[in-house]
Every structure is written in C-alpha cells, then in structure tokens.
Design a protein with these regions (language model features):
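Short pre-catalytic strand/loop immediately N-terminal to key active-site residues, enriched for Gly-Thr
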Residues: 1-12, 275-278
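Structural helix-boundary/capping segments
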Residues: 23-28, 34-128, 139-148, 217-245, ...
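Serine-dependent amide/ester hydrolase catalytic core
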Residues: 126, 160, 183-287
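General small-molecule cofactor/ligand-binding pocket signal
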Residues: 151-156, 296
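Charged, often glycine-rich, active-site loop that binds/positions anionic groups
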Residues: 165-178
Length: 329
C-alpha cells in the first residue's frame, strides 16, 4: 500500500522498499530498476530514488530480469543518504563483468549547482496522455528554473509508444531467456508430476505469477523464428538510435528534466485490470533505462516527482541539481 494514501498502489516493483523508507522504518532501502522500478515507487511515495549508470553498482545477487537494463539503486528521504549509499555500493566487482569503476562523490561536490542548461522532451509534456495537473506543475517548475538564470531548451525525442514497445520487446525477450532456467531441475521450486514434461509445465505454471508468464510468453514470441528479425532486431536498432539521440542531447544540455509518470498513482487493483495501462505508466522512465543513464526521482515538482537525468557516469551532476531543486521548489 502507498505510504501516503493506502488506497493507492505503492509502485512496482520496488514498492516495498519505497514504503519502508517513506514510513521511516529504514533510513534507506535498495531496489532493482530495469525500466523504472526504483524511480516510479520513489515518486509515488514522495522520496528520492536513483537508477545509476548501468554497471556502476554490481548486479551480483540480483535475480536477472532484463540483463541489458537491470540496475541496483538506493532509495532514501534525503539526497545525502542517496550519496552515501551510492558511494558504498559503487565499484568494479569481479562477480559482475558488466560492473565498472567509478569515483567517489563528495558531500562538497554536490553542494553547489554548476548546471547551466536544462532540457526537457516537448512530446512528453504535450502528450494527450499526460495528466493536466502534472503538465501544469511541470511547466511551473520550468519557469522557476528559468527565473534563476538557467537556460531551458525543448528537445525532440521518440514518441512514448515507441519507447514502451521497444523496451518491452527487449525486456520480455531477455526475461524469457533469463527465467528459462527456473524449471525445477537445478533452480526454482520443483513440483512433481507424472512425467518430466508435465513436471516442467506444472512447475513453471504454478510458480510464476500471471504477469511473469505474460512476459515470458511475449519474450518467446519475439525471439521465435519469423518474428526475431522483424521485431527483436528492430528493437535493438531503435535502442541504438535512442542512445545516439541522448549523446547529441547532452552536447546541448547538462541535465534532462521530466515527470516520473504521466499520471497519478492508480488505485490498488486497477493496474491488474488493464495491463496495457500499467505498461504505459512506464512511458517516461524506460527511455532513460534503454540509454543506460543515471536518473534520479526527486519528490518535488509534480504529484509523482521529477526525473533528473545526466550523461553516463555523471551521478554527481544529478545529485547537484537535486539539491538545487530542493531549495527552489
């Protein structure tokens, strides 16, 4: 249940982590963010949540969902706690070959704002799908930023439906591959049946949730013969275009600002009735995941917060700007 309104969802999949922090059961918590699963719950529960640069924090010990975008990130009520936990968790790990070395972020380095230019995606804000109040609140935040002498630029980006479909095409394909080992032979809870084939079927049918099974079936479909070239490989090509788009954007701006979600948190149970609506709630988070960029949810600016994104390996600038926004809004 949401920490602020128990009739609303806490967000997923790290909703429990976010609620624990929001209710002050813990000083910080750790979540997994593949397409927004740290950032969305952080926004829904009005705390900070960071998805770091892909590879900055080791994924060793994390159950793999979509390996190309899986990240581990901290959630906390203060920017300083985010900084401390990030420093402790960051670094190269021999048990995760995708992990990278990184420099420690000092308290002093994030105390003064050095951001000169901020960008935002016009199509996110002008979308018909965005809640009018979130749109109005975001625009008001932009005006406050301009009033402080920071240049703000409108940026072009991929449409939300393309981002969501690309993300779920790749994520489902990787999910089908990653979870294929959970058949009860070496991994997973085994449920015996009359023969081996039925044992596999019952084990996977009973142990996976409906949503997990939906994603596995979707992943197997896009990887199957006749679909792979048309769907999966096209998804990979679009992901490369997204990364190139971000590279050009960060030649023009220091930070990209966006809402975390286009709408307010739904009531408990509503998302299960409409899986498509649930997927579309990720419209503003998945693009940054595909770009493997550092992105922080800050609990200001709109009903579900603001996303602050910088170029790869620039978490310091993200935290800097979060401190600036905290004082501004």
């Amino acid at each position: 249940k949401n920490a602020i309104n128990p009739e609303l969802v806490a967000g997923g999949s790290s909703g429990g982590s976010a609620v624990n922090v929001a209710k002050e059961y813990t000083v910080f918590s750790i979540g997994g963010d593949t397409g927004g699963s740290v950032r969305q719950p952080a926004g829904y529960n009005k705390i900070y949540g960071l998805k770091p640069t892909y590879g900055r924090i080791s994924r060793y010990g994390l159950m793999a969902y979509a390996s190309s975008t899986d990240c581990v990130g901290p959630l906390a009520k203060s920017i300083e706690d985010i900084r401390i936990v990030l420093n402790v968790m960051s670094g190269k790990d021999t048990k995760d070959q995708t992990s990278i070395t990184s420099t420690e972020i000092s308290e002093k380095s994030i105390s003064n704002n050095t951001v000169k230019t901020v960008g935002y995606f016009k199509n996110f804000i002008e979308s018909e799908a965005i809640n009018p109040q979130i749109k109005a609140d975001f625009k008001a935040t932009i005006e406050k930023i301009k009033a402080k002498g920071i240049e703000v630029k409108e940026l072009d980006f991929f449409q939300s439906d393309i981002l969501v479909s690309t993300y779920y095409t790749l994520a489902m394909a990787e999910t089908a591959s990653n979870l294929s080992r959970l058949d009860g032979t070496n991994y997973g809870n085994r449920i015996e049946a009359e023969n081996l084939k039925e044992t596999y079927a019952v084990t996977r049918s009973e142990n996976f949730s409906e949503e997990t099974k939906r994603r596995i079936v979707g992943g197997n479909q896009v990887l199957s013969q006749g679909f792979s070239d048309e769907i999966y490989l096209k998804g990979l090509a679009i992901r490369d275009q997204i990364a190139e788009n971000f590279k050009k954007d960060f030649e023009e701006v220091d930070i990209i600002l966006s809402p975390v979600t286009p709408n307010n948190p739904p009531k408990i149970g509503d998302s299960l009735k409409d899986p498509l609506a649930m997927y579309l709630s990720d419209a503003y988070t998945v693009g940054f995941s595909l770009g493997q960029l550092p992105t922080l949810t800050a609990p200001q600016g709109t009903a579900t917060g603001l996303q602050i994104t910088a170029a790869k390996n620039n978490e310091e600038l993200v935290l800097q700007f979060a401190n600036f926004l905290k004082e501004l809004i």
